[in-house]
């Protein structure tokens, strides 16, 4: 039973970290609120996530980020900042999720969380210019909304169905990897076209 609980916590942690790669603030807010409502139990070291000041700050930043990422002029700036925020969020979520049910060393948990969230965030950051260039910026709000929705679904699955959340993260990383490859090819083709133009 203890092994099953530990595996479940680790799989759920991957789900939360993947969600953080898409939206760094949403899973932090959701986990803090879930702990506050007694739906989940975080280790004593992560009780600050469910404190009133933390929930207020996370909620405000989440709303600002949610709006800002829909604006083409701001999304690139937010993605640049997210290069540091997303891995940090993933590290916190992974260690918080595994703190009670797993014997995974905190340092290892933090590294796994940071890598998972960072990889997802890096892929969407590389792919976003491709979306902007092929849709003249019109597709950015739609893609951003899809990312937020996926982050929410992943967060819920991570807390309720960890195994499914882990599978979704794997599929997501493959899909983002393919989109990143397409974005790089598009950027190279555009660069060659620009060089060849008189």
What are these regions (language model features)?
Residues 83-95, 139-153:
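Small-residue-rich segments of transmembrane alpha-helices in multi-pass membrane proteins
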Residues 75-88, 107-110, 135, 141:
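Cytoplasmic-side transmembrane-helix entry/capping segments in multi-pass membrane proteins
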Residues 9-11, 17-34:
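The first (N-terminal) embedded transmembrane alpha-helix
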Residues 62-75, 125-132:
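C-terminal ends of transmembrane helices
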Residues 88-97, 106-127, 149:
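Mid-bilayer segments of alpha-helical transmembrane spans in multi-pass integral membrane proteins
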Residues 45-53, 98-106, 125-136, 184-197:
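A cytosolic-side transmembrane-helix exit/cap motif
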Residues 1-8, 34-52, 93-109, 158-166:
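Helix-coil boundary and interhelical linker segments in multi-pass alpha-helical membrane proteins
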Residues 20-25, 47-58, 82-86:
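Helical membrane-embedded segments and adjacent short helical loop/helix-boundary regions
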């Amino acid at each position: 039973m203890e092994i099953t609980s530990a595996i479940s916590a680790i799989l759920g942690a991957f789900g939360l970290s993947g969600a953080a790669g898409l939206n760094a603030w949403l899973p932090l807010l959701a986990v803090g609120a879930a702990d506050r409502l007694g739906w989940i139990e975080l280790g004593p070291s992560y009780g600050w996530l469910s404190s009133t000041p933390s929930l207020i700050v996370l909620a405000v930043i989440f709303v600002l980020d949610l709006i800002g990422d829909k604006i083409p002029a701001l999304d690139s700036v937010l993605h640049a900042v997210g290069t540091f925020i997303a891995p940090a969020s993933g590290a916190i979520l992974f260690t918080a999720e595994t703190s009670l049910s797993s014997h995974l060393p905190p340092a290892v948990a933090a590294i796994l969380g940071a890598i998972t969230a960072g990889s997802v965030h890096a892929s969407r950051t590389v792919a976003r210019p491709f979306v902007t260039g092929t849709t003249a910026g019109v597709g950015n709000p739609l893609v951003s909304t899809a990312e937020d929705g996926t982050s929410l679904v992943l967060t819920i699955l991570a807390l309720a169905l960890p195994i499914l959340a882990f599978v979704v993260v794997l599929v997501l990383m493959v899909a983002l990897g393919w989109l990143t490859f397409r974005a790089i090819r598009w950027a190279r083709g555009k660069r060659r076209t620009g060089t060849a133009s008189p």
